[in-house]
Amino acid sequence: MSSIKLLMTWDIQPGREEDYFEFHIRKFVPALEGLGVALSEAWLTVYGEQPRLLAEAVMPSMDNARQVLDSSAWQDLGVQMQELVDNFDYKLVPARGGFQL
C-alpha cells in the first residue's frame, strides 16, 4: 500500500479574505480532521498565473482517499468552500517527498 497525496488548489474570492480565514480555521481544518485527513503542507502563490493557495494532505492509501472523497461530508465541505473561493480543485497523486503539483 502506497501513501497518496490529496492536492487541493483554490483562489480566495476578492473581498472575502476575512470570511475565508475564519471558515478555514473554524470549519475546514476541523472537518478534514474529522474525515481523518490532516493537512501537511500549504503554499501561497506570490507570482504567476497559478491558484493562490495549494494545500496537501497525505493519506495512507488510495482506498482511504476514495472513501473520503466519496463521502457526503467531503461534498458538503466542497459546497461551503465554493461560497468563499474560486477555482477549487483537487486531485490524488502518489506521494513523493517534497513539493508536488
Residue ranges and their predicted role:
Residues 1-2, 101:
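Basic/polar N-terminal segments that are highly enriched at the extreme N-terminus
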Residues 3-5, 36-40, 53:
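Short, flexible segments with low predicted structural confidence
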Residues 4-11, 56:
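Active-site-flanking beta-strand signature of metal-NTP-handling nucleotidyl enzymes
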Residues 11-23:
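Short, surface-exposed ligand-recognition loops at beta-strand->loop->(often short) alpha-helix junctions
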Residues 23-40, 58-93:
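An amphipathic, aromatic/His-enriched active-site/gating alpha helix that lines ligand/cofactor pockets
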Residues 42-45:
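Short, solvent-exposed loop/turn elements at beta->coil junctions and helix N-caps
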Residues 47-51:
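Short acidic/glycine-enriched loop/turn segments that link adjacent beta-strands
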Residues 93-101:
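Short, low-order "capping/linker" segments at domain edges
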